[in-house]
Design a protein with these regions (language model features):
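Glycine-rich phosphate-binding "P-loop"
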Residues: 44-58, 167
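Active-site-adjacent C-terminal substructures of enzyme catalytic domains
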Residues: 17-40, 64-184
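Divalent metal-dependent hydrolysis catalytic cores, especially in the metallo-beta-lactamase
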Residues: 1-15, 37-49, 76
């Protein structure tokens, strides 16, 4: 018996221009997924331009994914690359939800990315967030809760795409991701 997962990027990350615009538009698909026990893997980031980039995970979880989880309580969901305390809290509040955590969200904070200058190597989506969020992610990652697990989200880009005026989001961590995890 084969199983598969559906990834819903919602036009929020690199190369996801064809993603959907609102989770609730896909209720008929989620109903079938729940019935057939197909998990939903989701990049949880709002695409609303009025939402600050550092608040997009929380906005998406509150406005979109919470409604899906409420309507489909048996649908298994994975929030990919959680970046905030809000993401951790969301997973803990929903027994059918798990979450992946990346090496870069565990080891860096937004000051590393933007201060004293912008570092394209640390630009990813969801963006690296506050130091308090990072500490919460680390505490959760080493806490033993099986709802949380490693998701490397390694995303290499050609040099011209990563360091240009329109730097592509994504961190290539395949070469060192496990070492970062071991250090934590």
């Amino acid at each position: 018996r084969q199983r598969c997962a559906v990834v819903s990027h919602m036009a929020a990350t690199t190369n996801s221009q064809s993603g959907g615009s609102a989770m609730l538009n896909y209720n008929h698909i989620f109903e079938a997924m729940e019935e057939k026990r197909i998990p939903l893997l989701v990049h949880a980031e709002s695409t609303d331009d009025n939402v600050d980039i550092f608040d997009r995970e929380a906005a998406f979880l509150e406005r979109e994914l919470s409604q899906v989880c409420e309507r489909f309580p048996e649908l298994k969901v994975t929030v990919e690359h959680i970046s905030t305390s809000d993401g951790i809290d969301f997973v803990k509040a929903h027994p059918q939800v798990g979450g992946s955590i990346t090496p870069h969200h565990l080891s860096r904070n937004r000051s590393d990315m933007i201060s004293p200058a912008f570092h394209a190597d640390l630009f990813c989506k969801p963006v690296i967030n506050s130091e308090q969020d990072r500490l919460t992610l680390v505490e959760t990652a080493i806490g033993g809760d099986p709802s949380f697990f490693l998701g490397t989200d390694s995303a290499p880009h050609p040099t011209h795409a990563k360091y240009g005026k329109d730097a592509k989001a994504g961190i290539f961590n395949a070469a060192y991701g496990l070492e970062v995890i071991a250090e934590i």
